[in-house]
Amino acid sequence: MQAAWYSQNGSARDVLHVGEQATPTPAAGEVRVKLHTSGVNPSDVKSRTARPVSDAFIIPHSDGAGVIDAVGEGVPASRIGERVWIWNGQWQRPWGTACEYIALPQQQAVALPAQVDDDAAACLGIPALTALQAVHLAGDVKGQTVLVTGASSAVGHYIAQLLTQQGAQVIGTVGSEAKAAHARSAGCQHVIFYKTESVADRIRAITQGRGVDVIIDMDFSGTSPLLGTGALKSHGTVVCYGSNNPGEVPVPFRALLYGSITLKFFLVYDLSPQDRAWCLDKLSSLLQANALQHTIAAKFKLKDIVQAHEAVEQGRLIGNVVIDLTP
């Protein structure tokens, strides 16, 4: 099969290769999916750059969509021909979705409603599931004010939609006018231009000094200083799913303690079985109801995977980047 892979960390141009790899055979409990699309997420390019390579090679990307064409022992043959989307394709294993075929445990290939196309389906495993878990951890947000950092990102756009559906007032941070328009299209009633405005001052103005009830955060290294400014109410909650600084991050401990602030962190690859089941069930319902907007910023063929990774790294596109694996 045709696949893209890397054997060492480095820039996309230096380490990504495209060529032939062995076509996998599904083991017991597995399905093989003929992939139509592969989603490229920021975590994929970060892994290529910095996560130690302990296998002979890594076929990148965890998200994708396609059709089951073979099943292993113990999997009903009736699943052959089923359209599916994939989660955790390359989590703790070297075989991701940047290839023509993937074999993986059958529960990681989820039935896809007919009305959801393959491009949108390549955006579900990380962006949509991260958004669902973040909003789930935020609790009952009806009538509350929620700050979403990175509201125009793939994850942030889904988060803003979900919060709006649940009756929250959503404030989003963005980096440009185009990204502000995208955030508003997801339901953000207010946007803050974090590059040119004081986020804390704008929050206090919007909330008349009360602060927000919840912060759903993509970059704890950037948001941690905000927690000592009164931007978050006492007894407020922070739900965080990432940090641009993966090392130690200082926190305003006194403000957190005396504000009785709740911090909730999670890694979408490592949800508890109960949370994973809840998110998958909720996402299936939303997809059936056509209740989510999906934004595809750019599509590339597998031979152009270097440009796809570079596009994600540059951060200028609005929406998801997808690899088209069809002939």
Language-model regions, residue ranges each:
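Glycine-rich beta-strand-centered segment in the early N-terminal region that forms part
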Residues: A22-G39, T49-Q90
